Amino acid sequence: ARQVVEYINESLGGNLNIAYGLSLGGKILSRVLEINEVVIEHAIMDAAPLLSLPRWLVGPLKYLQCANVWSCYHWTGFWKWLFHSHYFDVLLDECKKIYPFGGSKAVLDGYTSVYTTKLESISGQDIHYWYGTKESFVAKPQVRHLKTLYPDTKIEIFKGMNHGQILVDHPEEVASRITRMQYEQDIIDTSID
């Protein structure tokens, strides 16, 4: 998150109109908003993990995720056979990009960070949280926590969707929603003049 803040400050003058983060990207976006050193006019966190897990669960889950990434990288054919969806093709491609550069240690460190940090505060002008109905059991506690920190959070729930599925299966819908946010902001800005 610190690197993102530095980039926004150095390259964009400290201001970003819209930011979208899915899952770990949403976690990073939440940290950028927590640091509160740049202006992000519209922030969309899609299924971002905002709460820490119980300590007893962190170890087993991070090793499970590491095994998942390792097997995605080494047994791609098995995963494609098991899951007949291009959603998993995207996941497999990501695993193949990441694993060779950091191996198990990078995956374990990443998941340890995700699973052990809790969002303590958040600042922003227009904050959105998206999730699919098939991931509600995980997303609802995140939403409750976010609403305690930022009561004006706009929640969007996508019927029949799982983790990240709206972006993978319907990228044009995500682009359309982001474009509408930009368009609505432009209308507000020109009406002030």
Write out the residue ranges for each language-model feature.
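Active-site loop/oxyanion-hole signature of alpha/beta-hydrolase fold enzymes
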Residues: A1-I18
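Gly/Ala-rich beta-loop-alpha elbow adjacent to hydrolase catalytic centers
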Residues: G21-L29
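Flexible "cap/lid" loop of the alpha/beta hydrolase fold
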Residues: E34-I35, I40-W70
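Conserved alpha/beta-hydrolase catalytic His-Asp/Glu region
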Residues: R55, S71-S121
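Short beta-strand/loop motif that positions the catalytic acidic residue
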Residues: S123, Y129-Y131
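Short alpha-helix in the alpha/beta-hydrolase fold that links the catalytic acid
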Residues: Q125, A139-T148
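Acidic catalytic loop of the alpha/beta-hydrolase fold
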Residues: K134-V138, G164
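Catalytic histidine-centered segment of alpha/beta-hydrolase-like enzymes
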Residues: M161-E172
